[in-house]
From Swiss-Prot:
It comes from Methanococcus maripaludis (strain C6 / ATCC BAA-1332). It catalyses: Endonucleolytic cleavage of RNA, removing 5'-extranucleotides from tRNA precursor. Keywords: Endonuclease, Hydrolase, Nuclease, tRNA processing. Pfam families: PIN_5 (PF08745). One of its GO terms (molecular function) is ribonuclease P activity. This is RNA-free ribonuclease P. Signal peptide: none annotated. The keyword Nuclease applies. Belongs to the HARP family. It comes from the Archaea. Its EC number is 3.1.26.5.
């Protein structure tokens, strides 16, 4: 049987869906539960869980510290997650993947530009409508219109440019390390999932990950 390896994104530990699936209320509890299962899987079944260093590792540790996780939990992360930097100079990625990525990025930029243009038009129109009847103060009109338009613009722009694509170095490192190690990617991120499929990598949704490991352990205990 081929050795099982998993490559974890930050969302494998921190995502809210993971907490719900485990029946816990905070990140500290979910992180500790996951690390305990990862430790058992490593000791009993030699299943290794990897995390890209230092991009994803630094992101995860920073998140856990901000959530005031116990020092013992941080020690478990350091102990049971194998930290490794992807060999970015040796990993081979098909040129077609880069072609698809650039094409996807260009389409998103164009959509983002159209959203920006629409936001400017909506701002001007709202300002005109609000200022005409009552001769409102200029600053009041600007503040009222801009706060509404900017919030709407941010949501639309973020969803258009960042949703379903790779938008950070940690995201890319997860895929590169998984490819290097022939490991399954563990995340709850549309962009990572989409490009993992494009690269022919196994993908495990973060909310299912602890239960998959537990299933391995339960079967082993029955032997």
């Amino acid at each position: 049987m081929q050795k099982q390896r998993f490559c974890l994104d930050t969302t494998a530990i921190t995502d809210s869906d993971v907490r719900k699936s485990l029946g816990v209320s905070n990140i500290s509890e979910s992180a500790e539960k996951i690390m305990d299962i990862v430790a058992q899987a490593r000791v009993q079944l030699d299943i290794s869980c990897h995390i890209p260093y230092n991009t994803v590792y630094k992101e995860l540790i920073g998140f856990l510290i901000r959530e005031e996780c116990a020092p013992e939990t941080l020690i478990k992360v350091d102990t049971w997650l194998v930290k490794k930097t992807p060999n970015r100079y040796e990993i081979k990625i098909p040129a077609e993947i880069f072609h698809e990525y650039i094409k996807d990025l260009r389409e998103r930029i164009n959509k983002g530009m159209r959203i920006s243009e629409n936001a400017m038009y909506e701002t001007a129109l709202e300002a005109y409508i609000l200022s005409k009847p009552d001769e409102k103060d200029k600053e009041d009109v600007l503040n009222e219109v801009l706060s509404k338009t900017v919030n709407s613009f941010r949501d639309k722009y973020r969803n258009t440019l960042r949703g379903g694509t790779l938008d950070s170095a940690p995201d890319l490192d997860v895929l590169l390390l998984a490819k290097e190690l022939d490991a399954a990617v563990v995340a709850n991120d549309e962009g990572i999932e989409k490009w993992a499929q494009r690269l022919g990598l196994r993908f495990v949704n973060a909310r299912d990950f602890p239960f998959i490991l537990q299933e391995y352990l339960d079967l082993w205990d029955k032997k």
